[in-house]
Regions:
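C-terminal motif of bacterial Sec signal peptides marking the signal peptidase cleavage site
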Residues: 14-16
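Bacterial signal peptide processing site
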Residues: 18-21
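Post-signal peptide N-terminal segment of mature Sec-exported envelope proteins
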Residues: 26-47
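Noncatalytic modules at the cell exterior or secretory-pathway interfaces
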Residues: 41-50, 108-128
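Short amphipathic, basic-aromatic surface patches that mediate peripheral association
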Residues: 50-61
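Short coil-to-beta strand junction motifs in C2/discoidin
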Residues: 60-69
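An anionic, turn-rich surface loop/hairpin at beta-sheet edges
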Residues: 83-111
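Edge beta-strands of jelly-roll/beta-sandwich modules across compartments, strongly enriched
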Residues: 126-137
Length: 142
């Protein structure tokens, strides 16, 4: 009976161990921000979301609705892709801060599997007062 209990415990622990379904990175500062995205699983697709936070009272926040960003993807083989996206800056607010979170890309299946580098650069044309940094959330889906 003791052996059966040990086997059941071992199988339970074995099944409980799995790779994380995603990862998040938040980088402080005004940019550019460099993230790593592990896309080594060739059977999965990936969802990417950006999030940010501004700490400033409403009167001191710039009336900017969105932040233009250049997003550069660098493959494991050093090939690059680049695009301009606009991150909305108002979703959840309190008196002293506001947070934004937006789905950037859904169901990404890269041609080259491995660890990608994503460099995000804000445009100089927009100044966002109280910007704390930028975060990238990567969710793996099977």
């Amino acid at each position: 009976m003791k052996r059966a209990g040990t086997v059941i415990l071992f199988l339970t622990l074995l099944l409980a161990c799995s790779a994380p379904k995603g990862a998040e990175q938040f980088l402080k500062g005004k940019g550019p921000w460099t993230f790593s995205a592990d896309m080594t699983d060739s059977l999965s697709t990936y969802d990417f979301s950006f999030y940010t936070r501004r700490d400033a009272a409403p009167a001191k926040r710039a009336q900017v609705a969105e932040l233009p960003l250049t997003v550069q993807w660098i493959s494991p083989a050093a090939d690059t892709l680049s695009e301009i996206v606009y991150l909305p800056l108002s979703s959840r607010s309190t008196f002293y801060s506001s947070e934004s979170s937006v789905l950037y890309r859904e169901g990404v299946s890269p041609e080259a599997h491995g660890v990608w580098t994503i460099v995000v650069t804000p445009h100089d044309t927009v100044t966002v007062r109280g910007l704390r940094g930028l975060g990238l959330a990567v969710k793996r889906r099977k």
